[in-house]
Amino acid sequence: MRRLLTFAVLVCALALPAGVAARPSGTTDGTLSVKDARGIITIQGRGGVIGSFAKGSVTINDPVDGDGTGPIVTGDDWSKDKSETATIWGGTKVRFRIIGGTFRVVVRGRGVNLSFVGKGGVILNGYGTDDDGSYAVNGGDYNLIPAFALPFALSATSP
């Protein structure tokens, strides 16, 4: 009986951390996918953004040092510090990401592709060309990016 009790305690001790690790994190997080956009995409939120653009610039404001990875940008032709917490990078074939914590990301350009997972405010504003790209929210269907500022809150319950 004692062996059975010891075995049961051991199984529970091993199963509990595995169950906690398997639990989905960020169940209130929403997702945004942007494909081949032309215009200005603004994200102010908490979570993670990974993206790239063919030509343009990205401004990343990371107001809290150490609450995530901080901005990581590659392929830029130039950069300029805007403030103590914000930097602008520009060029062609630029890739960027910021994972974790709060941030503000503003991408201006063409050939913009990005993914955002988290919660926050988003503004999509196309340049008014024939093809300003498309976006999808929370795994839904892709819609055309409008030629006017379209603000919305992103979370798991966003339409």
Q: Where are the language model's segments positioned?
A:
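Bacterial N-terminal signal peptides
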Residues: A8-A15
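Predominantly extracellular/secreted and cell-surface proteins with exposed
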Residues: D36-Y135
